[in-house]
C-alpha cells in the first residue's frame, strides 16, 4: 500500500492531472506538440467488457491514450467467445472494438491480482469499469478504494441502470435497456412487432456518453487538481437519446408509435420500394417537396390543397405515400439516383454491407482501418468517424491477444522482477500469451 501511495504522490508532483501545467497531461510546450494526439501521455486502466466500455476506451485510444485492458485469465473479455464468425480462433466481435489496447490477464478475485490492479490505478489517469454496482467494492476496487491511493483518478463506472435505485443491482444488456427505455417500442413496422435495432445502439450511445464524460473529467481534474467519479448507465443514455420522441410525450402527452422507415412528423421522409431495391428520400420543407414532385413527374401534387404544407401532408400521409410508392416502383434504384443527383433533396439507397464498403464516399472518408493482427494477419474494421486537422488517426495497433502484454506491463510499467512474475504465472494469478 505504501508503494502505491508513493507512486500516486510522485504522479501528482510530476504535474500530471494538476491545474497550472502547460498542457493537460505533460509539461511540454504546446508549440512543440502540434502533431501530437490530444491524449498522448494519458494512461487508462480498462476493466470493461463487451461493448459500451470497450467502445469508449477504443475511442480514447484512437486519440493517443495508452489503454491497459484488464481481462480474466483463461477466458478474457466475454466477446472473445462470441461468434461465429471467427477468424482462426479470434472473434470478429472482439476485433471490432479493441484496437489500440494492451491486454493484461489478471485474476482480480485473488488478493495478489487486486494488488496489481491497485498499483496500476496509482499510475493511471482514468479507471473505467462496467461491473454491477458494489461488485468491485467487494474486491477492494471500488471508487472509494481507488480514491484513497489515487486521488487524481477519473473513475468511470458504466452500469445497466445506475449506482442506486430499485434496479441498480441488475446486470445490464443492450437489448434489455433498449426495451425498457422505449427504443424498441418505437422501432419496427407500423403495424408489426417491436424490433431490436440491427446494432447495439444503446451500448454504443452509452460508450459515446462515457467517452465524452471521461474527457470532461480529465479537463475538470486539470482545473481542480482532483479526480472524480462518473456514473454512466445504459438506461439513462438511451432515454436521453429519445430526444423529440420523448418531448412529444412529456410536453404534448402524445404516446409514440412505430413508423417503420417513415417519420412521425415529416412526410414524405421514408424508404420507397423501387423495381430492384429501396430508396430513402426526405422532403423536410415545401420547397423540397415541390422539387421532389417535379423529379417524379407529378407536378399536380405541388398545388394540391391536401399537400401544400408539411402539416397537411402528415394529415394525408396514407394517400400521398400510396401515390409516391406507385411512382417509385416504376424505375430501378440506379435511375432514381441519377434523377435525384444535384437536386438538393436528401436521398440514398438502402445498402447491403457489401454496398456500404464499396460506396465511394465511405472509401473517400477512409472508414476502413487495416491492421496486422499477430495471429490472424491482416484485418479490416470500421475506423474512427472523426478526422482532425493537426494529427492523423493512422497506425492503429491491432486488438491484443489475451494477456499479450502481461509480462511487459508488470516488468516495464510496475517494475516487477522476473522472479515475482514467474511466481504469479505459476500460481495462475496472471497469464501471458506469447506471440511469435
From Swiss-Prot:
Keywords: Acetylation, Mitochondrion, Transferase, Transit peptide. The keyword Transit peptide applies. It comes from the Eukaryota. It is found in: Mitochondrion. GO terms for cellular component: mitochondrion. GO terms for molecular function: succinate-hydroxymethylglutarate CoA-transferase activity. The modification N6-acetyllysine is found at residue 392. Residues 1-8 form a transit peptide. It holds the Pfam family CoA_transf_3. The active site is at residue 203. Its EC number is 2.8.3.-, 2.8.3.13. It is an enzyme of class 2 (transferase). InterPro entries: CoA-transferase_III_domain, CoA-Trfase_fam_III, CoA-Trfase_III_dom3_sf, CoA-Trfase_III_dom_1_sf. It catalyses: glutarate + succinyl-CoA = glutaryl-CoA + succinate; 3-hydroxy-3-methylglutarate + succinyl-CoA = (3S)-3-hydroxy-3-methylglutaryl-CoA + succinate; 3-hydroxy-3-methylglutarate + glutaryl-CoA = (3S)-3-hydroxy-3-methylglutaryl-CoA + glutarate; hexanedioate + glutaryl-CoA = hexanedioyl-CoA + glutarate. Belongs to the CoA-transferase III family. PANTHER family: SUCCINATE--HYDROXYMETHYLGLUTARATE COA-TRANSFERASE. Coenzyme A (CoA) transferase that reversibly catalyzes the transfer of a CoA moiety from a dicarboxyl-CoA to a dicarboxylate in a metabolite recycling process. Displays preference for succinyl-CoA and glutarate-CoA as dicarboxyl-CoA donors and glutarate, succinate, adipate/hexanedioate, itaconate and 3-hydroxy-3-methylglutarate as dicarboxylate acceptors. Acts on intermediates or end products of lysine and tryptophan degradation pathway, in particular catalyzes succinyl-CoA-dependent reesterification of free glutarate into glutaryl-CoA to prevent renal excretion of glutarate. This is Succinyl-CoA:glutarate CoA-transferase. The gene is Sugct.
